[in-house]
Amino acid sequence: MTTTEAPSALSFECETGNYHTFCPISCVAWLYQKIEDSFFLVIGTKTCGYFLQNAMGVMIFAEPRYAMAELEEGDISAQLNDFAELKRLCTQIKRDRNPSVIVWIGTCTTEIIKMDLEGLAPKLEAEIGIPIVVARANGLDYAFTQGEDTVLAAMPARCPEAATSEADQQERTNAIQRLLQFGKSPAAEQQPASSKHPPLILFGSVPDPVATQLTIELAKQGITVSGWLPAKRYTELPVIAEGSYAIGLNPFLSRTATTLMRRRKCKVIGAPFPIGPDGSRAWIEKICSVLEIEPQGLAEREAQVWDSIEDYRQLVEGKQVFFMGDNLWEISLARFLVRCGMRCPEIGIPYLDRRYLGAELAMLEATCQSMGVPLPRLVEKPDNYNQLQRIEALQPDLVITGMAHANPLEARGISTKWSVEFTFAQIHGFGNARAILELVTRPLRRNLALGTLGGSQWVSEAVTSR
């Protein structure tokens, strides 16, 4: 893996607290929409079903492409035949929806009762004739967004090692190019000719507009994206040959990166993630460096974006932001916000893979030094009680936290922002830097508006009276 060692100047701690995050089975919310010909079957209890129903807000009559296989007492006491029950459900799914793949999502309960999903899946797959992918997205071992990591880590084994024919290879290579040229006139500005370079796979689930933007940015450098993991359709999974290059888009995909390296012999590129203009430039430059391509116009592109968000930078400059830790985006967001002029005393994060995040950690340290602000304290698996004491002492201008702690902090007069909003928003690439700052500054702009109306005095009096 081409990466950067974690710098020693940063302070790393582990408080061994519990995961205070969304359940990782919530990855179904975006993955079932991303993989259009899939069906997700979550195998769990009523609690899992209630969570999915409430968290996703999709009514059952909308016929979403996911469902619950609800475990009962007979399953837990081994009185029922797991294979027969799952076969009945999957046969019904095949008859009603006919997906190209069924993804079984394991939960805490399947982990506790040691249900052998990996052993059952191949037998059932052979009987019903539909691929079955098993992902253990349980909340005992994984945090919020790591559910996506478990699903994507199971996908490389299903990717072809080589195109079935030369025509198929040409079809896969030109698919994205046809998408980019759709609706353009012949007189439209032409992109530089693609350089001859090894195959490049991008892994990480992002909305289609973001995927298009990143593909265009790479095409400007003469780089062709060979495929995406996950693909829009299971039948279009990318060819992953030995020696292919792969680079992640999200900081919580360390298991997927490891699988690509060990199982498919890919060369995983370690780079800062494309968050903010600084991260987007570093991400593209690292790809160009590995592929031995001279980057063109990135400094100008970055400067242009910084100019366009200057109004938001003035709002956050000098402010202090505290990350409690929820979705593993904390380090990338902190690095971008420090570059915007904020100070960050502490970054809490549920899980920290220093190898996969090595380049991001190095850039965080360099950014803090260039901006002349103290290095943040990084706390893995933070203890929320201790964190609340530190927040009380620091009194930061903004706390980015999970939903469970937002209202209690607001009641104490501390402005908060839900971290889950960054998970579902479009935040990658040059074009979405403004969207990040719009989310971050919303509580700050609200406070300014309340101050203008005299509302801040009412809030402070209410807090003091408590």
From Swiss-Prot:
Pathway: Porphyrin-containing compound metabolism; chlorophyll biosynthesis (light-independent). InterPro entries: LIPOR_BchN/ChlN (IPR050293), Nase/OxRdtase_comp1 (IPR000510), Protochl_reductN (IPR005970). SUPFAM superfamilies: Helical backbone' metal receptor (SSF53807). [4Fe-4S] cluster binds at residues 23, 48, 108. Gene3D superfamilies: Nitrogenase molybdenum iron protein domain. Keywords: 4Fe-4S, ATP-binding, Chlorophyll biosynthesis, Iron, Iron-sulfur, Metal-binding, Nucleotide-binding, Oxidoreductase, Photosynthesis. It is an enzyme of class 1 (oxidoreductase). It catalyses: chlorophyllide a + oxidized 2[4Fe-4S]-[ferredoxin] + 2 ADP + 2 phosphate = protochlorophyllide a + reduced 2[4Fe-4S]-[ferredoxin] + 2 ATP + 2 H2O. The keyword Ribonucleoprotein does not apply. Pfam families: Oxidored_nitro (PF00148). Binds 1 [4Fe-4S] cluster per heterodimer. The cluster is bound at the heterodimer interface by residues from both subunits. Transmembrane segments: none annotated. GO terms for biological process: light-independent chlorophyll biosynthetic process; photosynthesis, dark reaction. Its cofactor is [4Fe-4S] cluster. GO terms for molecular function: 4 iron, 4 sulfur cluster binding; ATP binding; metal ion binding; oxidoreductase activity, acting on iron-sulfur proteins as donors; oxidoreductase activity, acting on the CH-CH group of donors, iron-sulfur protein as acceptor. Its EC number is 1.3.7.7. Belongs to the BchN/ChlN family. HAMAP family: ChlN_BchN (MF_00352). Component of the dark-operative protochlorophyllide reductase (DPOR) that uses Mg-ATP and reduced ferredoxin to reduce ring D of protochlorophyllide (Pchlide) to form chlorophyllide a (Chlide). This reaction is light-independent. The NB-protein (ChlN-ChlB) is the catalytic component of the complex. NCBIfam families: DPOR_bchN, PRK02842.1. Protochlorophyllide reductase is composed of three subunits; ChlL, ChlN and ChlB. Forms a heterotetramer of two ChlB and two ChlN subunits. This is Light-independent protochlorophyllide reductase subunit N.
